[in-house]
A protein has these predicted regions:
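Active-site microenvironments that recognize anionic phosphate/pyrophosphate groups
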Residues: 1-86, 90, 94-113, 117, ...
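Conserved, mostly hydrophobic/aromatic
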Residues: 121
């Protein structure tokens, strides 16, 4: 059984927070002051997180755009594919390091996502003593079929991690990245324009579960249900609602770019 990660509260209090208040200076916009850079590709920068609040981890950040603007679903397909490919490469590279039991790769967007910085970015965190595979299984990636083609399979979770609506994108590690990026953009547009139209917040998470596939789980964010907070009980919708979501998301998934 995994032990909880320890969070450094005092260091956390020093982090800049501008996800709600745009008057707070963005630490990612002034690139001349960025340090501990690990790699770059065009305007994308991978660097160490200046605020390593989680003990026994290797926290890094991928700055995806040059400015605070540029939510992933609004980007040109080629730029989205470039960002996704860079992130996948660095995640897979980090997973090869023997000092980590598992490696997280995820993105926050919006004030209810748990993030602190508005500037588009994602995070890769190596965990020295925590193996997320003990908590997450392939069953969490299964569900009602929303779309399937030669590159991806998209489902709505019947066994979500937290609920209510979790969208899973399954693909082979050698799948061309552009169609995966396009499908991710389409799911995010659906989430932002329908389910999450009030909070405008989401997360997406990457998983490798040693079953021959990689997964992206898109989660629309709201206030967390007390059933999960108090009892770890996830919730999902019924068949009728799932059928409606299948119909509603279809127009978003029809486009090929």
């Amino acid at each position: 059984m995994n032990k909880p990660l320890r969070f450094n509260i005092e260091l956390g209090r020093t982090k800049p927070v501008n996800i709600r208040d745009e008057q707070v200076r963005c630490p990612f916009c002034d690139r001349s002051k960025l340090t501990d850079i690990l790699d770059t590709s065009g305007h994308i920068i991978w660097l160490m997180n200046k605020y390593p609040v989680l003990e026994k981890t290797w926290p890094t950040v991928i700055i995806e755009t040059e400015t605070d603007e540029g939510e992933f679903s609004t980007l040109p397909a080629d730029e989205a594919a470039h960002i996704l490919q860079f992130g996948l490469d660095k995640w897979r590279e980090t997973r090869q390091r023997q000092e980590f039991k598992s490696v997280l790769f995820f993105k926050n967007h919006g004030y209810m996502s748990g993030g602190s910085i508005r500037h588009p970015h994602s995070q890769i965190i190596g965990l020295e003593n925590y193996d997320y595979h003990k908590d997450i299984t392939a069953q969490n990636m299964e569900g009602w079929l929303l779309h399937e083609d030669q590159h991806v399979r998209i489902t709505l979770s019947t066994h979500p991690i937290i609920g209510f609506f979790e969208y899973n994108i399954r693909f082979k590690p050698d799948t061309p990245v552009r169609p995966v990026a396009i499908r991710l953009q389409q799911v995010l547009r659906y989430v932002l324009h329908t389910l999450s139209n009030l909070s405008q917040s989401y997360n997406y998470f990457f998983y490798n579960l040693e079953d021959g596939y990689d997964y992206i789980k898109v989660v629309a964010r709201y206030v967390t249900t007390p059933l999960y907070v108090g009892y770890k009980i996830p919730q999902t919708c019924d068949e009728e609602r799932a059928a409606k979501i299948t119909r509603d998301i279809a127009p978003y998934l029809q486009a090929t770019k």
